[in-house]
């Protein structure tokens, strides 16, 4: 027999497994939804991405969850993805958005062995800039509740944790320089370095951000708008720094290379200063780089999260443990100080991306999708 939900809702075939596809704890699943779609390749997010309002809500397969997104994360690399830089074989139109957190509203039979409707889950997978996203149960992460703080760990937190763990060789007393330290991933690099008993220097762009860095344990915040970073490092750290966590690129990268101590390690997790350019790159003094590294027995180490998925789950467990103990601050920026106010709804993803590239955010930029949920915030 065919069971019909409320007007405008999806029809559900009432078979022995039908209960696995019912949203019995919330409103009926609609037929259509809104989502963001890349319709042309460009690093200009406004030119590349279109908000579509009448997309079919996808059905979960046997091993899948249908997640109603409540919060989605903004990443500097969103415009790299919209420009087609990560997968040249991917042609428009395609979905966008790397991470989300919300509630399970439907699921396949196999997925129901581990998950239930109404459960809070987070995930890192393409297509989060949508009201609903199908997520393989195998990559979903159960969460205590639908809080934006948990979202900050998915990309930003794990990038800092795994890069420092695998490449940083942190130990007590080492000096660590974190660029863009008050941003989404920088905040984690600062705190994880302090947990490792390192001395941490962090660059930022305002006195307010410097105060935030102090509050999370940064030993020497540097507001580069009022203090030349190069001068501070030369005067206060004449022997150099042991580790650099670098995400800015360009002139900041060159400065970081010069600041390395003997046997220092520079970890490149990004170069946001170049992402908006046609090439996606920021010019550096590459010609002299081999000589500078050689003279110090220093090393340059790249980090791309996708290459460390085998250790992703353990990293998330560690971050969740630190947060639960109160040893980790997960700062969320929902746009309260943005020109157009708080980021609410998929249409505000465009404003949130713009805001990120003004450099004014403190912590992880997050957009709220206002759905009724049963989880307590």
Swiss-Prot record:
Its EC number is 1.3.1.48. Belongs to the zinc-containing alcohol dehydrogenase family. Quinone oxidoreductase subfamily. The modification N6-acetyllysine is found at residue 35. NADP(+) binds at residues 185, 205, 209, 224, 247, 269, 275, 303-305, 361. GO terms for biological process: lipid metabolic process; negative regulation of fat cell differentiation. PANTHER family: PROSTAGLANDIN REDUCTASE 3 (PTHR43677:SF3), SHORT-CHAIN DEHYDROGENASE/REDUCTASE (PTHR43677). This is Prostaglandin reductase-3. Transmembrane segments: none annotated. It is found in: Peroxisome. The keyword Ribosomal protein does not apply. Induction: Up-regulated by high fat diet. Down-regulated in white adipose tissue in ob/on mice. InterPro entries: ADH-like_C (IPR013149), ADH-like_N (IPR013154), GroES-like_sf (IPR011032), NAD(P)-bd_dom_sf (IPR036291), PKS_ER (IPR020843), Quin_OxRdtase/zeta-crystal_CS (IPR002364), Zn-ADH-like_protein (IPR051397). Keywords: Acetylation, Lipid metabolism, NADP, Oxidoreductase, Peroxisome, Phosphoprotein. Widely expressed. Functions as 15-oxo-prostaglandin 13-reductase and acts on 15-keto-PGE1, 15-keto-PGE2, 15-keto-PGE1-alpha and 15-keto-PGE2-alpha with highest efficiency towards 15-keto-PGE2-alpha. Overexpression represses transcriptional activity of PPARG and inhibits adipocyte differentiation. GO terms for cellular component: mitochondrion; peroxisome. The lineage of its organism: Eukaryota, Metazoa, Chordata, Craniata, Vertebrata. The modification Phosphoserine is found at residue 299.
